[in-house]
Amino acid sequence: MIALPLERRLSPMAHWRAFQALVTLFRTEKPDLVHAHMPISGFLARMAAWWAGVPRIAYTCHGFWFNYTGNLPRQAIGYLMEFLAGRVTGVFLTVSDEEARDARRLWISRHAVSVRNGRDPAVFHPDAAARTRIRSALGVPEDCVVVVVVSRLVRHKGYPELAVAMRDVPDAELWVVGERLESDRGGDMDALLRAAGLGDRLRLLGYRTDVAAILAAADIFVLPSHFEGLPMSVIEAMLTGLPVVATDIRGPREQVVPGATGLLVPAGQSRSLAEALRRLTGNPTLRAAMGAAGRMRALDMYDETKVVARTLDLLGL
């Protein structure tokens, strides 16, 4: 592993330094293939690989930047970056079908293909022993309905709406798993959640290495994001047999079959979110049916082994 000076935020000078470092690296190492990810780092890596004469360049899009910002100049910059880098990209992959269609429709890449995301079913699965162990450690009785969210603690994951919605879901606890990255910006979601007035029904669990066990101990998974690629956390929850309540946005709406494996709600609307959560908290039979259907869907579509094999095949490896 080689660390390079990459910045997630827009910073022309920082990006120029990163580009130079990448060109130097590629000219030194002479790779046969460069496979890039994410909007800014993916743009820089592909352009640097082209400049350095790397024979094969691939890219996996985890969500187009221009689809996620309402700022018109940023949308234009995001599209221009993808369009330019698309000219030098031999293999163009996306994690969602919708993004692949966007890439083809917007002339970013005529050959864009969705490979999806995947997780390991041997790690994420229903686990009665883990459920008992985690609930015992947290002092949560078996009959308590637990809603869990696993994500970075940032505003665009929908925490403001979730905090308000949970006030109207009195018969359930909310477990929040995750933390902020140093590079994350925006308000303090810990403070926002604590101020929601949920009292003992809120558990901020922070960063955990036992996410599979935490999911197995929960009853409902929620992810009210404003934008996503194809969230791994939803796949993990589905493999664990949890019904999923998510927002009707790119990514989750490909994963969740409304009424069959979970429920979709409009982004940014706490009332709809509360209604969906109440529908599930009050109906254990529905939770079990949706969870089982979601697990079957995840095993078919999001098994890590299948996703990796498809990716390697498309990369010619």
Predicted regions and their residues:
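Glycosyltransferase donor-sugar binding loop
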Residues: 119, 150, 173-188
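Helix-loop-beta element that forms the nucleotide-linked donor phosphate-binding surface
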Residues: 99-122, 126-127
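Short hydrophobic beta-strand element within catalytic cores of glycosyltransferases
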Residues: 243-246, 256
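A short, well-ordered alpha-helix in the C-terminal region of glycosyltransferases
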Residues: 49, 136, 279, 286-300, ...
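Nucleotide-activated donor-binding/catalytic signature segment of Leloir-type glycosyltransferases, i.e.
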Residues: 187-206
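Aromatic "clamp/platform" in nucleotide-sugar-dependent glycosyltransferases that forms part
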Residues: 207, 226
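A conserved mid-protein helix/loop that constitutes part of the nucleotide-sugar donor-binding site
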Residues: 145-168, 172, 187, 263, ...
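Conserved acidic donor-binding segment of nucleotide-sugar-dependent glycosyltransferases
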Residues: 258-259, 263-270, 279-284
